[in-house]
């Protein structure tokens, strides 16, 4: 699972800079002469730059997370007015972008234009579903946004600290806007499941009850660069703690009171998103946006059933090799078996680190290009761990000297299974998220927005595909570890079944849990957390298998077409060197590569 740095959330209206090139195109149109390739390329690149700069200005948290400090003292406007104003601006961008004739553009230019058209189209369609009315759940929201941001930034100057203090003072305004949005959601009957918000409330209360000096919002003052004078350090400490104590903790407390007294009583009892107004239509939209395909919920459900059956057939082979009469006997043997549980939180963390380190040594045999950005394996913050996934990856940022981070959930560590740890380390770290996302950020000669595209089917599909690459380099030698790999794979197949089950076929939460129990030996802690995740984050879990199956199909196609010319390093490079793509554009890219390799001398 990948958590991105703070992206566009809800934006303040910002007038766009007038394009000097638009009149240029208009002049050509009026004269009856087509605009030259040079003129059209200039318009395209100016539009890309305008969009990117507007995006950063409207989402200052995202800008800061990338190392752009121009907006470090500002926070986003979370109001519906701001969101609708930004959608109107995107409509303007879309109209201008669609009017640019792509004839003669490079493949990169054509792809960039097409990607942005799709992004704008999706954003405009999402307006109908008023996503801002359900802004929090047990996985996060406004209550976790700024603690996470504090952890992503680096503080090297007095201005960095003063900018943070300005943000701390503004946080209550953001909380107030979000509470207003939630209240509107009550009126519109667009509310999350009650029990998930009860879990979120626990996290809000935890953050609200901390001493100012213990709050993650005050984390930046725990360490100062030596260049900052002692007197300034004391001033910064005083002002930071005052902002947290007098502004932010009361804001958390107000949010907690609103959630407990007003919001939770109004939240829905049904788990599926289809129970909200236009919920079925919304789920169809989420499927298209998440998978970048036209697959229906019914088709995805069937794919999930088929993949579960395929994985179970492979698991049976391992079970028989290990001397078990059937798969059920193997599952019963490993489930809740202390042999496969970590002895301590430190032991669990060490297991992830060891697998990631071993894989790093094998990367040159799988890839022609490796990222410059380092990554580290760390413990997940306590305020996220209670209801968080087993692990997640957070993007790094070279401009902030921030490595990519594989965060491990150490809560209830001794109740977790070690069996999926090897595959998860490859998924979240290398050659999964860290390698793909970091290489995407390091792309050259592309519009800036392309470095940070995050199509879930591509990003998570690649990471799930990456779990299998351990087999290619001789890992998973222990049959139990290979069984753990298949447990991870069937986990993602189960997602197709239970996500569509709850949101499209009106399954209950217990039906989801029962399906997990029937088809996996995943530990209970993860089953419960994952079930809640799919309920609270509709369709996101559909991306993993969808993307993985596409990449596997493209690899199989390339191997068959190229025969001895097939180079696994070159294939991987062509898949990930252009950043995240919609799956159909990825297929076009790989097909073009296959054609070029077919005609090249061996």
Predicted regions and their residues:
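Short, cationic motifs built from Arg/Lys/His that form the positively charged side of catalytic pockets
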Residues: 7-8, 555
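Bacterial N-terminal signal peptides
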Residues: 12-23
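N-terminal maturation segment of proteins
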Residues: 28-602
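N-terminal secretory signal peptides that target proteins for export/translocation
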Residues: 1-6
């Amino acid at each position: 699972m990948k958590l991105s740095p703070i992206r566009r959330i809800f934006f303040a209206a910002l007038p766009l800079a007038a394009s000097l090139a638009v009149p240029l195109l208009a002049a050509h149109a009026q004269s009856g002469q087509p605009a030259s390739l040079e003129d059209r390329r200039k318009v395209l690149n100016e539009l890309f730059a305008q969009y990117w700069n507007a995006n950063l200005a409207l989402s200052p948290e995202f800008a800061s997370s990338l190392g752009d400090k121009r907006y470090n003292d500002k926070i986003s406007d979370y109001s519906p007015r701001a969101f609708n104003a930004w959608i109107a601006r995107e409509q303007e961008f879309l109209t201008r972008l669609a009017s640019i004739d792509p004839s003669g553009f490079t493949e990169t230019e054509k792809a960039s234009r097409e990607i942005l058209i799709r992004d704008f189209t999706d954003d405009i369609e999402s307006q109908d579903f008023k996503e801002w009315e359900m802004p929090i759940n047990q996985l996060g929201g406004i209550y976790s946004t700024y603690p996470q941001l504090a952890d992503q930034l680096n503080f090297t100057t007095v201005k960095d600290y003063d900018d943070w203090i300005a943000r701390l003072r503004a946080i209550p305004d953001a909380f107030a806007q979000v509470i207003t949005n939630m209240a509107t959601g009550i009126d519109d009957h667009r509310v999350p499941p009650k029990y998930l918000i009860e879990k979120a409330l626990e996290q809000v209360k935890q953050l609200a009850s901390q001493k100012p000096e213990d709050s993650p919002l005050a984390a930046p003052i725990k360490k100062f660069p030596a260049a900052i004078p002692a007197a300034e350090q004391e001033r910064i400490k005083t002002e930071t703690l005052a902002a947290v104590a007098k502004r932010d903790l009361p804001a958390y407390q107000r949010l907690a009171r609103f959630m407990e007294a007003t919001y939770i009583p109004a939240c829905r009892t049904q788990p599926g998103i289809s129970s909200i107004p236009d919920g079925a239509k919304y789920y169809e939209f989420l499927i298209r946006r998440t998978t970048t395909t036209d697959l229906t919920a019914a088709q995805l459900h069937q794919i999930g059933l088929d993949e579960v059956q395929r994985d179970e057939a492979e698991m049976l082979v391992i079970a028989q090799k290990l001397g078990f009469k059937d798969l059920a006997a193997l599952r019963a043997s490993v489930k809740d078996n202390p042999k496969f549980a970590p002895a301590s939180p430190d032991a669990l963390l060490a297991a992830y680190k060891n697998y990631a380190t071993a894989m790093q040594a094998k990367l040159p045999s799988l890839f022609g290009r490796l990222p410059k950005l380092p990554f580290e394996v760390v413990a997940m913050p306590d305020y996220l761990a209670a209801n968080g996934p087993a692990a997640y990856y957070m993007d790094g940022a070279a401009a902030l000297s921030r490595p990519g981070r594989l965060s491990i959930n150490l809560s209830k560590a001794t109740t977790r299974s070690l069996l999926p740890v090897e595959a998860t380390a490859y998924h979240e770290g290398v050659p999964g998220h860290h390698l793909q996302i970091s290489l995407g950020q390091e792309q050259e000669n592309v519009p800036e927005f392309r470095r940070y595209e995050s199509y879930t089917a591509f990003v998570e599909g690649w990471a799930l595909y990456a779990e299998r690459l351990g087999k290619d380099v001789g890992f998973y030698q222990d049959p139990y570890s290979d069984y753990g790999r298949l447990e991870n794979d069937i986990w993602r197949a189960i997602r197709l079944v239970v996500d569509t089950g709850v949101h499209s076929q009106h399954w209950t939460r217990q039906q989801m849990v029962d399906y997990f129990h029937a088809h996996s030996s995943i530990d209970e802690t993860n089953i419960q957390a994952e079930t809640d995740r799919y309920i609270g984050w509709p369709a996101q879990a559909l991306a993993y298998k969808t993307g993985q199956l596409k990449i596997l199909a493209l690899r199989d196609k390339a191997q068959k077409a190229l025969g001895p010319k097939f180079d696994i390093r070159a294939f991987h490079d062509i898949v990930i060197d252009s950043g995240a793509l919609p799956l159909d554009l990825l297929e076009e890219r790989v097909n073009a590569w296959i054609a070029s390799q077919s005609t090249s001398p061996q």
